[in-house]
Amino acid sequence: DAVLAPAKRLEQMGFSVARVQPDRNGFITAAALEQVMRPETVLVSVMAANSEVGSVQPVAELARTAHAAGALFHTDATQALGKVPVNVVDWGCDAASFSAHKVGGPKGAGALYVKNRTPFDACMLGGGQEAGRRSGTQNVCGAAGFAAAIQVAQEKQADEQARLGALRDKLYAALAEKPGVRPTVQVAPGS
């Protein structure tokens, strides 16, 4: 809902929104994205990782596809942070959003990366803090807690990837023993 709910709101405001159908394994391909892009497309927004099916999108490839069509690219990297390497610059993101609680940080804290010179209108008006991009008093404790949580998550990332991969492989093996049960998403063991 983090990406879909704002998309629905934009539709209610009169914007045209296209949804890309993922392939049977939950991945959005550049070809599928290209099929829904139109000359008037201004923004592409993709979840970097899906916590329900486990797919990690080819974010850099999707960003290149969006940029080639003249659109800005945003990723919701909340589910990816601390689980897979995240580098918004290498990915080519114009914007990326994160939430602290997914890496053990304080609830209510988050971060929005916006690439320098990316067009951006403030959603909160007032005192003009953050170069006019976000007014209001900053949650310093929340930001510090988020920073600490990211550091811990990055230090434990390789172990967490191995742990989650082992759990997934164990689940797939147990399900494979059940007659008539088959996974709806195919993931290579150890990935």
In which residue ranges do the predicted regions lie?
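Pyridoxal 5′-phosphate
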Residues: D1-S191
